């Protein structure tokens, strides 16, 4: 057992580095070359692109994303959506569940998938047993199970042609200046793989690499093998090895996320 195991148990009961190390190592061994292969293939493939200068207003994104969240089942009579620097959700109690998102007027997917992710968390909170709130029976099973709900909605549902077929009328109504994309084109845009710096905006290929990077650094810090002062250097070095790009500033590296 290690000091880090104690903290892991707080978040996912019974899990240790002996469980995670081989899982992550095997996944990373395949993901790093897969990421390189996909990004190289995308350079020569005829991929749809976002037109330069196209603006997706904050109000239009809010309207579109609220419609998606409501269709997913979120009860706006027992919760609300707001804006914040970093998306998050908070289940204050079953009758008051809130989540936030952020807006980028040149990238509507950033807001959309943040909303779908946080709505997934919020739906789990709204679905807990109200009669047993404040007891184990009325609480989330674990953070891992909680995250499974958010990631399921964001990716298994949200990054499919079937999803885009359903929401296409709302997309066109809210963004009339966008090209006349069909559900397949929008799905290809939403599934583009990129070597990006920000975890919460990562695609399915790179997301787990972001998580593994944090895991490896956390192990070193809590086991006494890395000083906090050296964290940026360790982060940037590992990111370069796995993603093949340099982190230009800590705002895009170890300081990007309040719960990284």
Predicted features, each with a name:
Residues 103, 110-130, 147-154:
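Active-site recognition of the HExxH zinc-binding catalytic motif
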Residues 23, 57, 91-95, 104-112, ...:
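Secondary-structure capping and boundary motifs in well-ordered enzyme cores
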Residues 89-98, 122-129, 183-192, 248-253:
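Active-site-adjacent bridging/hinge elements
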Residues 14-18, 37-49, 129-136, 157-168, ...:
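Inter-helical turn/loop segments and adjacent helix faces that build the functional surface
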Residues 45-51, 97-105, 129-136, 197-202, ...:
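Glycine- and acidic
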Residues 1-108:
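Contiguous, non-catalytic segments that form substrate-binding/exosite surfaces or channel walls
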């Amino acid at each position: 057992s290690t000091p880090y195991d104690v903290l892991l148990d707080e978040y996912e009961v019974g899990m240790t580095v002996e469980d995670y190390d081989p899982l992550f190592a095997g996944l990373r061994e395949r993901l790093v070359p897969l990421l390189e292969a996909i990004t190289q293939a995308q350079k020569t493939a005829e991929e749809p692109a976002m037109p330069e200068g196209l603006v997706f207003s904050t109000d239009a994104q809010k309207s579109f994303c609220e419609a998606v969240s409501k269709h997913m089942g979120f009860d706006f009579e027992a919760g609300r959506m707001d804006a914040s620097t970093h998306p998050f959700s908070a289940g204050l109690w079953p009758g008051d569940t809130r989540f936030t998102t952020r807006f980028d007027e040149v990238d509507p997917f950033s807001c959309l998938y943040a909303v779908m992710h946080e709505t997934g968390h919020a739906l789990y909170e709204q679905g807990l047993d109200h009669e047993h709130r404040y007891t184990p029976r009325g609480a989330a099973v674990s953070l891992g199970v909680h995250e499974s709900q958010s990631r399921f909605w964001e990716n298994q549902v949200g990054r499919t042609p079937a999803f885009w077929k359903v929401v296409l009328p709302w997309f066109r109504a809210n963004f009339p200046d966008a090209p006349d994309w069909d559900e397949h084109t929008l799905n290809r845009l939403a599934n583009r793989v990129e070597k990006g710096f920000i975890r919460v905006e990562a695609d399915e290929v790179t997301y787990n690499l972001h998580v593994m990077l944090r895991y490896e650094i956390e192990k070193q810090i809590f086991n006494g093998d890395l000083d906090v002062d050296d964290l940026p250097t360790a982060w940037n070095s590992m990111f370069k090895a796995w993603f093949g790009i340099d982190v230009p500033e800590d705002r895009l590296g170890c300081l990007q996320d309040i719960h990284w």
